[in-house]
Swiss-Prot record:
Name the record gives this protein: Bombyxin B-1
Disulphide connectivity of cysteines: 29-75, 41-88, 74-79
Keyword Transcription regulation in record: no
Matches recorded under Pfam families: Insulin
Alphabetical UniProt keywords: Cleavage on pair of basic residues, Disulfide bond, Hormone, Secreted, Signal
Highest taxon above the source species: Eukaryota
A GO term from the CC aspect: extracellular space
Any further remark recorded for this protein: Silk worm has two kinds of PTTH: 4K-PTTH and 22K-PTTH; there are many forms of 4K-PTTH.
Recorded family membership: Belongs to the insulin family.
Species of origin: Bombyx mori (Silk moth)
Function statement: Brain peptide responsible for activation of prothoracic glands to produce ecdysone in insects.
Signal sequence segment: 1-19
UniProt-annotated location(s): Secreted
Presence of keyword Secreted: yes
Length: 89
């Protein structure tokens, strides 16, 4: 009896932990998007102008993300916090 209860407890705890590890994709629009980005990016160092590549190089190597923005990725479709973090800095 004790062994089966312990086994069930271990299963329940592992399921709860695995559910927390999975990041849920959500939509972020308007003020909610701006506030979430501000909270996530707080303290992230901004890039200076000298760190930017020339325009022609940037457009060539950015790929499809260069044509989309944070609104396209997170308002029109659900996105994760990792995607939002990629827009910091």
């Amino acid at each position: 009896m004790k062994t089966s209860v312990m086994f069930m407890l271990v299963i329940v705890i592992s399921l709860m932990c695995s559910g927390e590890a999975q990041e849920v994709a959500r939509t972020y629009c308007g003020r909610h998007l701006a506030d979430t980005l501000a909270d996530l990016c707080f303290g992230v160092e901004k890039r200076g102008g000298a760190q930017y590549a020339p325009y022609f190089w940037t457009r060539q190597y950015l790929g499809s993300r260069g044509k989309r923005g944070v609104v396209d990725e997170c308002c029109f479709r659900p996105c994760t916090l990792d995607v939002l973090l990629s827009y910091c800095g």
